[in-house]
């Protein structure tokens, strides 16, 4: 709660969801940016930023805001905040049909910082943008990992092929709260660091033409995870139905490395 501000009603992020949430400061900045750049009757699409959607819902804004979200734990929280101008669509961004989502004046997205996710998010966002609309993206800054400079060039090239022109790029403009699982791991390792050490660059694109390319191919592994929550700690277990019967299943946990933390 100390670091999540008004967003502590969400369950703790789980590593499998690739979920790093912006701080309240960054969410307020993004909310102001979105509202100032849109007319009162514009529609806004949010991809992968539930805290931004929650913040906009709480402001009781005039613009209509829609979020596409597949994480059911997040969806349950967001539905408590949704109202006439704030709509939650339960769906997978990797599979969502842009024609079913409609067209928007602004799309704001914060995809996981991995290549396949970026291409899928950008493709869907571009297909849902009106001509002249804006795409606002959080991207990993330089030195995030080896080769990130080449990855960014490839992403920007993909944006250009979608008719998107880079309007502005602000280094380390956004900050993130350290998720509990990361904080727990650093604490166990004896490392002391700021809970806001992670930053993202903010890129703004404008849709200048309606060029489109085919949706990038991506096959996501279909895994059946069973989640158990113990005193706020979310544990997921991969289940093979063929190996589980009605008599139950004994589970033993053994650490793979010293100081391993759940």
Predicted regions mapped to residue ranges:
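A short glycine-rich, Lys/Arg-flanked "PGG" loop and its adjoining helix->strand segment in the class I
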Residues: 119-134
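C-terminal lobe and adjacent flexible extensions of AdoMet/dcAdoMet transferase-like proteins
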Residues: 205-262
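Class I SAM-dependent methyltransferase SAM/SAH-binding core
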Residues: 52-85, 94
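Class I S-adenosyl-L-methionine
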Residues: 162-219
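S-adenosyl-L-methionine
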Residues: 1-55, 68-71, 210, 217-218, ...
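Conserved beta-strand signature within the Rossmann-like core of class I S-adenosyl-L-methionine
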Residues: 131-144
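A short acidic, Gly/Pro-enriched loop at the edge of an enzyme's catalytic core
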Residues: 95-108, 114-115
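Short alpha-helix
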Residues: 148-169
């Amino acid at each position: 709660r100390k670091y999540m501000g008004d967003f502590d009603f969400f369950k703790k992020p789980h590593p499998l969801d690739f979920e790093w949430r912006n701080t309240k400061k960054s969410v307020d900045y993004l909310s102001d940016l979105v509202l100032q750049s849109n007319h009162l009757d514009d529609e806004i699409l949010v991809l992968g930023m539930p805290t931004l959607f929650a913040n906009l819902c709480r402001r009781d804004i005039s613009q209509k805001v829609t979020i596409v979200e597949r994480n059911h734990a997040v969806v349950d929280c967001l539905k408590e905040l949704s109202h006439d101008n704030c709509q939650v669509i339960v769906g997978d961004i990797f599979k969502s049909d842009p024609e079913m989502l409609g067209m928007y004046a602004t799309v704001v997205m914060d995809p996981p910082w991995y290549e396949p996710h970026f291409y899928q998010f950008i493709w869907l966002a571009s297909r849902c943008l009106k001509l002249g609309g804006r795409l606002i993206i959080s991207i990993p800054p330089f030195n995030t990992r080896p080769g990130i400079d080449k990855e960014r060039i490839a992403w920007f090239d993909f944006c250009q092929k979608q008719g998107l022109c880079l309007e502005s790029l602000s280094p380390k403009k956004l900050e993130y709260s350290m998720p509990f699982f990361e904080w727990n791991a650093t604490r166990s390792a004896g490392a002391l660091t700021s809970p806001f050490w992670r930053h993202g660059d903010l890129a703004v694109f404008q849709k200048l033409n309606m060029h489109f390319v085919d949706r990038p191919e991506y096959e996501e592994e279909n895994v059946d995870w069973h989640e158990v929550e113990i005193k706020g700690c979310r544990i997921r277990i991969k289940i093979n139905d063929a190996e589980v019967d009605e008599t139950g299943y004994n589970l033993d946990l053994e650490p793979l490395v010293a100081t391993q933390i759940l």
